[in-house]
Amino acid sequence: SNTKQPTPLGGVIFA
């Protein structure tokens, strides 16, 4: 499943 995680760079990653 894909979950949105906040990144230190100010974006989001789908992992």
Swiss-Prot record:
Superkingdom in the source lineage: Bacteria
One Gene Ontology biological process: urea catabolic process
Reaction(s) catalysed by this chain's protein: urea + 2 H2O + H(+) = hydrogencarbonate + 2 NH4(+)
Compartments it resides in: Cytoplasm
GO cellular component, one term: cytoplasm
This protein's record includes keyword Hydrolase: yes
GO MF term (any one): urease activity
EC code(s) of this entry: 3.5.1.5
Principal place of residence: cytoplasm
Signal peptide span: none
Annotated pathway: Nitrogen metabolism; urea degradation; CO(2) and NH(3) from urea (urease route): step 1/1
EC class name: hydrolase
Keywords, alphabetical: Cytoplasm, Hydrolase
Subunit and partners: Heterotrimer of UreA (gamma), UreB (beta) and UreC (alpha) subunits. Three heterotrimers associate to form the active enzyme.
Sequence similarity: Belongs to the urease beta subunit family.
Protein name (record): Urease subunit beta
